[in-house]
């Protein structure tokens, strides 16, 4: 996901990390997050220029490039750290994201209900350097074919 958002026009900053764990005072490690006991989700922090890119466009890209219908799973990766989540920093972002998910479910945009967690951001910690550059080529190819108009 980090590799995708780095290519989006209007995105200013992207970094991989961990969001919304149970112990928000202690920075988690990848090994700790993988135990499934920290409550943290693997996440990508995205800072964007709203005058160049609408939040709904970011949401469209997010939902088109992962499976938001399987709880605590992405592909072969299983565990609460792999949950689909949107963690917002403002009440407006929260309302937009909640409305977007509700509309996806109302429109039956996916073969199963969207189970993406939408919540205020309570904590974000950057991932260790070795975990920040993983790229999944098929995901990037899907993005470039569907969202060429949004690319830098």
What are these regions (language model features)?
Residues 1-152:
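Flexible coil/turn and secondary-structure edge motifs
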